[in-house]
């Protein structure tokens, strides 16, 4: 069994978390685990989107994309 700890949240937050856990039929601990994993996934996707956006704004990448687009019509393949 894993160790546990206590966290302090407002009564309102506790009640909201308890209601969400109850609706899903899981414990508050399981709900918090799911929410933490979801936040981590969202952060990863956000970082990937930001990196992709930054990459597409550089002139070198736009130039390379233009070169690749030119090869589509060269009849070689």
From Swiss-Prot:
This is Antitoxin MazE7. Antitoxin component of a type II toxin-antitoxin (TA) system. Upon expression in E.coli but not in M.smegmatis neutralizes the effect of cognate toxin MazF7. Residues 49-77 are annotated as: Disordered. GO terms for biological process: detoxification; positive regulation of growth. The lineage of its organism: Bacteria, Bacillati, Actinomycetota, Actinomycetes, Mycobacteriales. Forms a complex with cognate toxin MazF7. The keyword Repeat does not apply. GO terms for molecular function: DNA binding. Keywords: DNA-binding, Toxin-antitoxin system.
């Amino acid at each position: 069994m894993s160790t546990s700890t206590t966290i302090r949240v407002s009564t309102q937050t506790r009640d909201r978390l308890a209601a969400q856990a109850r609706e899903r039929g899981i414990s508050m601990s399981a709900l918090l685990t799911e929410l933490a994993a979801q936040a981590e996934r969202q952060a990863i996707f956000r970082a990937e989107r930001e990196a992709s956006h930054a990459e597409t704004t550089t002139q070198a990448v736009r130039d390379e994309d233009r070169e690749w687009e030119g090869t589509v019509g060269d009849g070689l393949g």
